[in-house]
Amino acid sequence: MFVDQVKVYVKGGDGGNGMVAFRREKYVPKGGPAGGDGGNGGDVVFEVDEGLRTLMDFRYQRHFKAIRGEHGMSKNQHGRNADDMVVKVPPGTVVTDDDTKQVIADLTEHGQRAVIAKGGRGGRGNTRFATPANPAPQLSEHGEPGKERYIVLELKVLADVGLVGFPSVGKSTLLSVVSSAKPKIADYHFTTLVPNLGMVETDDGRSFVMADLPGLIEGAHEGVGLGHQFLRHIERTRVIVHVIDMSAMEGRDPYEDYVTINQELSEYNLRLTERPQIIVANKMDMPEAAENLKAFKEKLQDDHPVFPISAVTREGLRDLLFEVANQLETTPEFPLYDEEELAENRVMYTMEDEEIPFNITRDPDGAFVLSGDSLERLFKMTDFSRDESVKRFARQMRGMGVDEALRERGAKDGDIIRLLEFEFEFID
């Protein structure tokens, strides 16, 4: 089964907890703190594997969680950093954040990697908190939670040339006679439901990859006829071969077909119209095809060349393939996303994001509810079983301006404050 879009959940590994420990050794009085730091959590990394052709594997596993770092130990022993979780994806995979709709990565080359969910930093042990005023601190940090998000994987096939046109105009037949591909061919619409790739070689030794894409109909850019699923695969092609049925046996006018398909391409993505387009008049072996071709050329406003062929009798294929190869030699690749745009999005998803420190809302019962990534991460990294850690958390909240913001919202002594699943009282 060909799967080209799937939604999955990814989570980086949590950092290991720091440790509270002291050096207890003979002849070493007042040995001081000796708690080690926790190890860093593993990242969720996507890597391109050219042996994969579909996102089928993601239908059966949709949750990917990297392992957490090892906890710190006594004698200042640092916890072991966790290994990254490497997930293989096929070339042509675009990774998008499901919430923000921002593109995280466009993976096209074999071995290319991208960090999709970063692991958390390991918590610090009590050795890190020693000061002249407090040489034996009784506090440490929990590990930082790993980044978690839902993402959408979208496969856009890698092909140099894309065959487009209405259903049943002969695209699959054309691919089958110019390459070794074996697409399903039948006399009904939407026989082709998934892209078929074939390697084409011309008589002079030039080669390229051609994709037989499912047929388009009017309204495809709005999703009609599964249009969105079909059009996404055209985006990477460098040359578009527009196949038109000149026999007009289905009652459609060839020129109207030509106009309709080009309108769908421009409505879906304006950059599709920038690609060279080769017009192919197929089924020239059928009656009235020659007359229809003459009328078609008269309606074309420009001197755009038209290649008359018959995929069944193989008439005109040599000239067509030479023209395709010539166009590929002079046509650069069309990146789906600018490098600057991708770089900006990658920066957006690092763990050092500029985030709103906190938000304050009210529950119906009058309690104040605190939220925000920075504050919640700080809360999760605090060890509330130790008094010094609790006092440090209170100082950090005060430094972030939480206390002052609560007073401005009308908080008074004894009011209930909620943060995640915990409650505590406000003390002014």
From Swiss-Prot:
This entry's Enzyme Commission designation comes to 3.6.5.-
Per UniProt, subcellular location reads as:
Cytoplasm
The segment(s) forming the OCT domain are 350-428
Q: Which Pfam families match?
A: DUF1967 (PF09269), GTP1_OBG (PF01018), MMR_HSR1 (PF01926)
Residues that coordinate or bind GTP: 165-172, 190-194, 212-215, 282-285, 310-312
For binding Mg(2+), which residues are annotated in this chain's numbering? 172, 192
- Annotated region (Disordered), positions in chain: 117-143
Which Gene Ontology CC terms are recorded?
Answer: cytoplasm
What CDD domains does the record tag this protein with?
Obg (cd01898)
- An annotated Gene Ontology molecular function: GTP binding
Show where the OBG-type G domain sits: 159-329
The annotated subunit structure for this chain is: Monomer.
Function statement: An essential GTPase which binds GTP, GDP and possibly (p)ppGpp with moderate affinity, with high nucleotide exchange rates and a fairly low GTP hydrolysis rate. Plays a role in control of the cell cycle, stress response, ribosome biogenesis and in those bacteria that undergo differentiation, in morphogenesis control.
Family assignment from sequence similarity: Belongs to the TRAFAC class OBG-HflX-like GTPase superfamily. OBG GTPase family.
Q: What is this protein called?
A: GTPase Obg
Q: State the organism named in the record.
A: Bacillus velezensis (strain DSM 23117 / BGSC 10A6 / LMG 26770 / FZB42) (Bacillus amyloliquefaciens subsp. plantarum)
Name of the encoding gene = obg
